[in-house]
């Protein structure tokens, strides 16, 4: 079996690499976490082949799980939970009832609407729609005799797919991640591509396994070890160079954030602290400003650090938070700063294909009021 993971860096062309390495004569299945990722994949395939190849299918991960692991095996699901008359009514995106809830006084109590995972009602609404959020958990739960649903589904996928690709796999957590690992054990050919250091950046799906176990953060080396123990060949070389960021930017990210990133870019672009010209930078419409949050509150052209993920700009100014105010010091360290915050800054600092301007929080606070929309 061919099971590979390519660990990439920002701007290395993850989606480009996947879309240009496929064999259009084979039955390819390309999966990604968000609709935006799917849109990017389709565009890249059109650039590479003129259109999406006839034998290539592109879909979101949730659609994949529903179509290939849930819907075809509904009779087995009904039998597993001893609900033989069960017939589903589609799927919904509302969240299932949580196990615990908070009272008006802040007390954490058991939720009476919660149903344990050994009951079918844990996975469906009262109108018999599957909860999108528990699809992977359901797929992992069901067995027919001694054979798991996952193993049966993998055998079926091997009949109809020559290669399966999963883009931005760092976005998958908890049961989604577990399902990918378990399914991959039985697939003939699967390739995962993602950037470890872009985990915990999106607005949702930011907690838990594989990047956090209980209260402990999982470091890069431990994550690689987890993938290898699951039987994956881990490639840390193919996409280690950024096609977007200049050498100066990559070196600065490596020095300050400890992230191993190199440049494949010959373009000119420097890292410039702009505290002495802060107002001129903020007033320049050609320089996108990246802020930690509430970008819409400002008069200047701005975007939140995390929302800029996947984008490329000619030049950006990253407005730092208090914890990074001394990043220009030789003694600066990220020790004590939350991993999710470091990763969001990494995303922000790697958006520019030219100059990267950095502005201290202390500088911005002095002039901030003049730029707030009132």
Please place each PLM-identified region on the residue numbering.
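The feature marks helicase ATPase cores and/or their adjacent C-terminal helical subdomains
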Residues: 1-374
